[in-house]
């Protein structure tokens, strides 16, 4: 199972918000932002804070990618 956060980065662009703005607004640690950039697993409570900050749902910020798929 792979997760990617491409939808998060696109949503930030749509909202004219930088990753640093999100980090401050959602109280996200720098190492968690690195995990997001690397498409690594992030704890659900953190994803919940991101969703609440952006007024989004989990599916708006991340997607499950099948192994071997490109994307």
Which residue stretches match the model-derived regions?
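The alpha-helix within a helix-turn-helix
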Residues: 12, 23, 51
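Residues that mark the N-terminal boundary/hinge immediately upstream of a DNA-recognition element
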Residues: 18, 43-46, 57
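A short, Lys/Arg-rich alpha-helix, primarily the initiator
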Residues: 1-20
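Short alpha-helical DNA-recognition segment
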Residues: 16-34
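Short, charge-rich amphipathic interface segments used for partner binding and complex assembly
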Residues: 48-55, 59-62
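Short, basic-rich loop-to-helix N-cap that marks the start of a DNA-contacting helix
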Residues: 39-52, 70
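Residue-level detection of the helix-turn-helix DNA-binding "recognition helix"
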Residues: 13, 27, 38, 66
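Short, charged recognition helix plus adjacent turn
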Residues: 2, 11, 62-71
């Amino acid at each position: 199972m792979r997760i990617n956060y491409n939808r998060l980065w696109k949503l930030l662009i749509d909202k004219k918000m930088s990753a640093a703005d999100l980090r401050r607004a959602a109280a996200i640690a720098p190492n968690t932002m690195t995990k997001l950039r690397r498409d690594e697993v992030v704890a659900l409570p953190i994803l919940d804070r991101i969703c609440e900050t952006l007024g989004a749902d989990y599916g708006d910020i991340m997607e499950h990618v099948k192994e071997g798929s490109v994307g």
